[in-house]
């Protein structure tokens, strides 16, 4: 996957850096694996905004991606590499030997015609799914289950990878993309390789309109609002914390800069090293 820049013949082209889509082999998704996707506009069932900056955007179909990879010991062939509007990485359409089709996340290096398989004793090559206990140490993996059989939850975004660093007492120690080291049950399945579309982080939309196509609305700074609209609003000119207020706050009045992680969270028992450990 590569990026391409454009001659600045228009203002929107000056800073635009878009993917080349060279790896995409078809523009038509598998109809049997698509479902309708309804927009909420960031509102709940009462019509109130629960998530800001959501609204509009192009109509999408949801692709049913197989995160469990629980069709064991049946080889599959990669038919296509496709764009998925609902995630940052590409997806691959695979067809099993018995004729069943499914979508999986497309790791770096996966190409049309390659064979992939899921099982206990499969080879540790790109696209294969296997339990953590059988993955060689130092291997890059993605789509990792938190509980056996629950389906992959960790390291699924574009360019993400986790490293199997060690094993102890029925657990595998995984170095997460954030740098955190966490214990996973070694019976949890994962997929070998790094998630594709590794240059996604370097994309630039070039104009506000493309961001709106993605369903993202503008973000207005609280400092520029009135006091009735935001705790940081009001004051004369560019007042840092509003008229007479002492601390920057969230829209709901919580002071910025405080730790938000809940004390005695159950996952504390599986975190060996925090991501910000010195």
Curated annotation (Swiss-Prot):
Residues 32-54, 221-278 are annotated as: Disordered. The keyword Disulfide bond does not apply. GO terms for cellular component: large ribosomal subunit. It comes from the Bacteria. InterPro entries: NA-bd_OB-fold (IPR012340), Rib_uL2_dom2 (IPR014722), Ribosomal_uL2 (IPR002171), Ribosomal_uL2_bac/org-type (IPR005880), Ribosomal_uL2_C (IPR022669), Ribosomal_uL2_dom3 (IPR014726), Ribosomal_uL2_RNA-bd_dom (IPR022666), Translation_prot_SH3-like_sf (IPR008991). One of its GO terms (biological process) is cytoplasmic translation. Keywords: Ribonucleoprotein, Ribosomal protein, RNA-binding, rRNA-binding. One of the primary rRNA binding proteins. Required for association of the 30S and 50S subunits to form the 70S ribosome, for tRNA binding and peptide bond formation. It has been suggested to have peptidyltransferase activity; this is somewhat controversial. Makes several contacts with the 16S rRNA in the 70S ribosome. This is Large ribosomal subunit protein uL2. The gene is rplB.
